[in-house]
């Protein structure tokens, strides 16, 4: 057997063992190979994967699992280092059970279709569980109308209180349609039995601006770039997840 042929067989066997058994000790230091060995190794890799395509899928799945684990670990560190601003900022609306043993925080944008889809399911989760404290973080990222809607919602909380905010928040998801302008939002609030003009007058206050700015800064620290994003325990859940998935995550956090 020639040296290249022997090297190819040797590398193929080692590659198979390494990929299927995950044994680091069997892996090669490719940088120490001679040119013929390196070329033979490349051919061995290609040949092995062509003959065993399922192995490649296993490798990809393992890499994705490792990346997910690393992401989760990194997210946990981010949440723990920002816990006070996430769970006890003193200005975000708090619903559900104020004394609940688990707090679920949601970053939202009223123009986000997945936030709208998640809204009714989150409410069902909170209501049926009975032991969840639910916090909403206004995080407008989809343009000027998103900012206007969040300004109005925060102003409703500051001017008219938590019940008014809850009406606006729920109404913007379930009833309001069309352009989100201050005038139309004020009229909508009036239809809900609120003082729409007074709320609109508070939209541009420094206090409202500070809430939105603080939420933006918090989202940056948490590396949140989209909505909805949920935080519970030391975990971040990025994106929409159906109700049963949310329940599973709640159970996992509770242990």
Task: Write out the residue ranges for each language-model feature.
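Second-shell loop/turn segments in exported
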Residues: 29-34, 43-49, 107-111, 138-142, ...
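Bacterial N-terminal signal peptides that target proteins for export
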Residues: 2-13
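C-terminal cap of thioredoxin/glutaredoxin-like
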Residues: 28-48, 187-255
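Structural alpha/beta surface segment adjacent to cysteine/selenocysteine redox centers
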Residues: 105, 116-190, 195, 220-225
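The canonical Cys-X-X-Cys-His
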Residues: 112-116, 229-231
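A short beta-strand-turn-helix
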Residues: 84-102, 126, 216
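N-terminal targeting signals for export/organelle localization
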Residues: 2-4, 18-82
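Extracytoplasmic/secreted envelope proteins and their assembly/folding machinery
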Residues: 38, 42, 46, 53, ...
């Amino acid at each position: 057997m020639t040296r290249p042929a022997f090297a190819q067989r040797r590398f193929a066997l080692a590659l198979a063992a390494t990929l299927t058994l995950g044994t680091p000790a069997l892996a090669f230091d490719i940088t120490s190979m001679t040119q013929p060995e390196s070329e033979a190794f490349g051919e061995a890799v290609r040949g092995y994967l062509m003959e065993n395509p399922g192995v490649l899928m296993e490798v990809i799945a393992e890499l994705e699992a490792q990346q997910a684990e690393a992401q989760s670990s990194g997210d946990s560190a981010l949440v723990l280092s920002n816990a006070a601003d996430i769970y006890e900022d003193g200005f975000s609306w708090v619903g559900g059970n104020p004394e609940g043993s688990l707090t679920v925080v949601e970053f939202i944008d009223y123009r986000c279709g997945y936030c709208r889809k998640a809204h009714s399911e989150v409410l069902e989760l909170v209501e049926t569980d009975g032991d969840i404290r639910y916090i909403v973080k206004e995080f407008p990222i989809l343009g000027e109308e998103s900012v206007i809607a969040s300004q109005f919602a925060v102003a409703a909380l500051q001017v008219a209180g938590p019940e008014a905010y809850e009406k606006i928040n729920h109404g913007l998801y379930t009833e309001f349609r069309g352009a989100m302008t201050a005038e139309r939002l004020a009229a909508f609030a009036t239809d809900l039995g609120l003082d729409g003009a007074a709320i609109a007058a508070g939209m541009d206050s420094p206090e409202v601006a500070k809430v939105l700015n603080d939420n933006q800064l918090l989202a940056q620290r948490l590396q949140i770039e989209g909505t909805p994003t949920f935080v519970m325990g030391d975990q971040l859940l990025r994106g929409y997840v159906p109700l049963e998935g949310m329940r599973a995550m709640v159970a996992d956090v509770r242990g």
